[in-house]
């Protein structure tokens, strides 16, 4: 079993089905790894940068798929999610992408079905099942995960959010799409340090594309 891979990011591709594929070169071998959008946005293609990706290997009859995450906690939460009936790998990644690990764990532990249902493809029944099956498990190791997860550095200002919302509405996006995009990019600690609305708008459009 591969726990993690450490190497150079050579390519980040987007498939026709909107999945993010990282090509990670390790000892002259290029590994194809599907990663969450939030991780793809934070990776650099600089030649001298070495990154560590925590992996999960899915073996099927016709193929083997590697999924990659920025921390082992994120990877472990992904594994917990895909063990739930009706939650596949893409839904698990969408949950992590839409909410971020801290908000996702909190929503599960507090049985916040409304927040869980913000994720594309997750209806109220699936959200209830996730909370029911994982609430007690996550409560036991929530503190340990929080210690290993980078702490958020703040929240975006109301002025930034309002301008981003107005611009996205003018571009034709729906309220639901805008809420999901803002929820997702607000988990980006690097972006939270940035006071320029242009960068927030660029990140939101990239997430929506």
UniProtKB/Swiss-Prot annotation:
GO cellular component term, pick one: Holliday junction helicase complex
Record-linked SMART domains: HhH1 (SM00278)
Subunit record text: Homotetramer. Forms an RuvA(8)-RuvB(12)-Holliday junction (HJ) complex. HJ DNA is sandwiched between 2 RuvA tetramers; dsDNA enters through RuvA and exits via RuvB. An RuvB hexamer assembles on each DNA strand where it exits the tetramer. Each RuvB hexamer is contacted by two RuvA subunits (via domain III) on 2 adjacent RuvB subunits; this complex drives branch migration. In the full resolvosome a probable DNA-RuvA(4)-RuvB(12)-RuvC(2) complex forms which resolves the HJ.
Region called Flexible linker, residue ranges: 150-160
Stored InterPro entries: DNA_helicase_Holl-junc_RuvA_I, Hlx-hairpin-Hlx_DNA-bd_motif, NA-bd_OB-fold, RuvA, RuvA_2-like, RuvA_C, RuvA_C_sf
GO biological process: DNA recombination; DNA repair
Record family assignment: Belongs to the RuvA family.
Keywords noted in UniProt: Cytoplasm, DNA damage, DNA recombination, DNA repair, DNA-binding
Domain I: annotated segments: 1-70
Function of the protein: The RuvA-RuvB-RuvC complex processes Holliday junction (HJ) DNA during genetic recombination and DNA repair, while the RuvA-RuvB complex plays an important role in the rescue of blocked DNA replication forks via replication fork reversal (RFR). RuvA specifically binds to HJ cruciform DNA, conferring on it an open structure. The RuvB hexamer acts as an ATP-dependent pump, pulling dsDNA into and through the RuvAB complex. HJ branch migration allows RuvC to scan DNA until it finds its consensus sequence, where it cleaves and resolves the cruciform DNA.
GO terms of molecular function: ATP binding; four-way junction DNA binding; four-way junction helicase activity
Protein name: Holliday junction branch migration complex subunit RuvA
Domain notes: Has three domains with a flexible linker between the domains II and III and assumes an 'L' shape. Domain III is highly mobile and contacts RuvB.
CDD domains: UBA_RuvA_C (cd14332)
Region Domain III, annotated ranges: 160-209
Subcellular localization(s) per the UniProt record: Cytoplasm
HAMAP family xref list: DNA_HJ_migration_RuvA (MF_00031)
Region (Domain II): 71-149
Lineage of the organism: Bacteria, Bacillati, Cyanobacteriota, Cyanophyceae, Oscillatoriophycideae
SUPFAM superfamilies, per database record: DNA helicase RuvA subunit, C-terminal domain, Nucleic acid-binding proteins, RuvA domain 2-like
UniProt source species: Gloeothece citriformis (strain PCC 7424) (Cyanothece sp. (strain PCC 7424))
DNA damage found in the keyword field: yes
Short name of one Pfam family: RuvA_N
């Amino acid at each position: 079993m591969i726990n993690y891979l450490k190497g150079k990011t050579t390519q980040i591709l987007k498939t026709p089905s909107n999945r993010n594929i990282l090509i990670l070169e390790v000892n002259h071998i290029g590994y194809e790894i599907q990663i969450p959008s939030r991780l793809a946005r934070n990776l650099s293609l600089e030649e001298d940068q070495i990154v560590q990706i925590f992996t999960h290997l899915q073996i099927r009859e016709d193929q083997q798929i590697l999924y990659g995450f920025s921390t082992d906690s994120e990877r472990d939460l992904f594994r917990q999610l895909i063990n739930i009936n009706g939650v596949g790998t893409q839904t698990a990644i969408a949950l992590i992408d839409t909410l971020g690990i801290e908000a996702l764990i909190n929503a599960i532990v507090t049985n916040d079905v409304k927040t869980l249902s913000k994720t594309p493809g997750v209806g109220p029944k699936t959200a209830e099942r996730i909370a029911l099956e994982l609430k007690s498990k996550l409560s036991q190791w929530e503190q340990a995960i929080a210690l290993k997860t980078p702490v958020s550095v703040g929240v975006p200002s109301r002025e930034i959010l309002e301008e981003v919302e107005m611009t996205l509405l003018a571009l034709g996006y729906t309220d639901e799409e805008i809420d999901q995009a803002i929820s997702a990019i607000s988990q980006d600690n690097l972006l939270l340090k940035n006071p320029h609305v242009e960068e927030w708008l660029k990140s939101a459009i990239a997430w929506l594309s």
